[in-house]
């Protein structure tokens, strides 16, 4: 599974500005989903890869980013 890492409180994606390989996104994806996860910056959001099927990613149901 793949997807954008999401802030559970406001429903927003984690933003990033350095597209492609991005240490911040990789670190945040691994903190949330485990050391087997990958991450990079895609369309100014942190995109996480190699996730388990039940991983919660953006968008959250009933929560819109404001």
From Swiss-Prot:
Keyword Secreted carried by entry: yes
Main subcellular localisation: secreted
Gene Ontology CC, one term: extracellular region
Location(s), subcellular: Secreted
Record keywords, A-Z: Amidation, Disulfide bond, Ion channel impairing toxin, Neurotoxin, Secreted, Toxin, Voltage-gated sodium channel impairing toxin
Domain LCN-type CS-alpha/beta positions: 1-66
Any further remark recorded for this protein: Is neutralized by the single-chain antibody variable fragment HV. Abundance in venom is approximately 5.7%.
Function noted in UniProt: Beta toxins bind voltage-independently at site-4 of sodium channels (Nav) and shift the voltage of activation toward more negative potentials thereby affecting sodium channel activation and promoting spontaneous and repetitive firing. Acts on human sodium channel Nav1.6/SCN8A and with less activity on Nav1.5/SCN5A.
Protein name stated in the entry: Beta-toxin Chui5
Taxonomic lineage: Eukaryota, Metazoa, Ecdysozoa, Arthropoda, Chelicerata
């Amino acid at each position: 599974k793949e997807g954008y890492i999401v802030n559970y409180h406001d429903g927003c994606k984690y933003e990033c500005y350095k597209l492609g390989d991005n240490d911040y996104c990789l670190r945040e994806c691994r903190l949330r989903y485990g050391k087997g996860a990958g991450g990079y910056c895609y369309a100014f959001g942190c995109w996480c890869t190699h996730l388990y099927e039940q991983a919660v990613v953006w968008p959250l149901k009933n929560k819109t980013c404001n």
